[in-house]
Design a protein with these regions (language model features):
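DUTPase catalytic domain/fold
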Residues: 1-139
Length: 139
């Protein structure tokens, strides 16, 4: 699958998402500018690009294990296919210290995920029980 990426600032030296290995689930994403997060602060960190996701997929910026060990974690709000703005990493500093994140830091991993688009209905037109374990009789 090919997904179009648009640089937010043309000609800027923005690092675009890149996989370290061909079969990695996520592509590393990088901070555009240096950031300093206060203790327990959550902030949107711009990544310098937007995506043109096809229908039927979403994306999330997952935490990197190395950043998590330092007390910086990415939250996981979905990036829907109709969102065309700049992609951000939503990062929380879980520590009691200021955390500096230099520009160009690998802050997370962009993962594209296929989704099911259900129709939510009140009735399916079939009888279903609300019992669970041993609901069909003795073993």
């Amino acid at each position: 699958m090919k997904i179009k990426i648009n640089r937010i600032v043309e000609g800027a030296k923005i690092k675009l998402p890149a996989r370290a290995h061909y079969n990695d689930a996520g592509a590393d994403v990088y901070t555009t500018y240096g950031e300093t997060l206060k203790p327990h602060e959550t902030r949107r960190i711009p990544l310098g690009f937007s995506l043109e996701l096809p229908d039927g997929v979403m994306a999330c910026v997952f935490p990197r294990s190395g950043m998590s060990l330092e007390g910086l974690v990415c939250e996981l709000p979905p990036i829907d296919s109709d969102y065309t703005g700049e992609v951000h990493a939503i990062v929380t500093n879980l520590t009691d210290k200021l955390k500096k994140v230099p520009g160009g830091t690998r802050i997370g991993q962009l993962v594209v995920i296929p989704i099911v688009l259900p129709d939510f209905v009140e009735q399916l037109g079939e009888e279903r029980g609300d019992s669970a374990f041993m609901s069909t009789g003795e073993a």
